[in-house]
Design a protein with these regions (language model features):
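An exposed tryptophan-centered "aromatic clamp" motif
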Residues: 121-138, 143-195, 199-201
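Compositionally biased, low-complexity segments enriched in small residues
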Residues: 1, 16, 107-108, 165
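Short, compositionally biased
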Residues: 28-134, 205-218
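Processing junctions and N-termini across compartments
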Residues: 19-22, 207
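Bacterial N-terminal signal peptides that target proteins for export
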Residues: 2-15
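C-terminal motif of bacterial Sec signal peptides marking the signal peptidase cleavage site
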Residues: 23-27
Length: 218
């Protein structure tokens, strides 16, 4: 009987220790999440160019400018907090030189620079350049960048809501990429992307699409 009592007490003690250990681990993991400043999808870029986890974000003491939506060894992309309305690619038809015209390249910065240096007037690019933010360097995303955002939209949307940013729409988003499938299509069309499903559409350059700015921080 005494052996049985010792055995029961031992099992109770082991169970209690297991519960305490589990609670301690959970508390530790929560602490790590709150102070996670790593470069990863879903973390938040602040106005002082630092990064914070959405779990540690405080609207009273932090100023968010965007959410990380893509990372690899040499590239980190952030999407801005604001929708910039619907705009057209250009107000006239023609090929913009030095724009990368495919659906995979992460080249919004280069494409935006090419559009700005061309003779074409782009209301979409103008909207991005007029975007008011404490961080500079926002661009019109390429089709490849919008596709990358689409792939991580669920995670990004949770963080965007946490910081009070605009929700993403269900409409097609205008990219800085022309339709490169032929010489004629480059003149006439740009690629638009649905963030909901990643679907890409070739759209006449004088047709409006939603504009959301992005920035490359590495």
């Amino acid at each position: 009987m005494r052996k049985m009592k010792r055995f029961v007490r031992c099992r109770v003690l082991v169970s209690a220790l297991a519960v305490i250990s589990a609670l301690a681990m959970a508390s530790c993991e929560e602490h790590v999440e709150i102070y996670d400043s790593s470069i990863k999808v879903g973390n938040i870029l602040l106005s002082d160019n630092t990064v914070i986890s959405p779990y540690g974000y405080d609207r009273d003491s932090h100023m968010a400018v965007g959410v990380i939506f893509y990372t690899n060894e040499d590239t980190v992309l952030v999407v801005g907090t604001k929708e910039l309305g619907s705009h057209i690619y250009t107000d006239s038809i023609g090929t913009v030189s030095n724009v990368t015209n495919d659906v995979v390249s992460l080249c919004g910065a280069e494409n935006t620079a090419a559009i700005l240096s061309s003779g074409f007037h782009s209301p979409a690019v103008e909207a991005v350049k007029a975007f008011c933010s404490p961080v500079s360097g926002w661009v019109l995303p390429s089709a490849g960048e919008l596709k990358a955002l689409s792939r991580n939209l669920a995670v990004v949307s949770v963080s965007m809501k946490a910081i009070g940013g605009d929700a993403f729409t269900n409409w097609q988003y205008l990219s800085s990429s022309q339709d490169g499938s032929s010489t004629d299509s480059e003149k006439m069309y740009y690629y638009s992307v649905s963030l909901v499903n990643g679907f890409i559409t070739s759209v006449l350059k004088t047709t409006e699409g939603c504009v959301r700015p992005v920035i490359r921080i590495r």
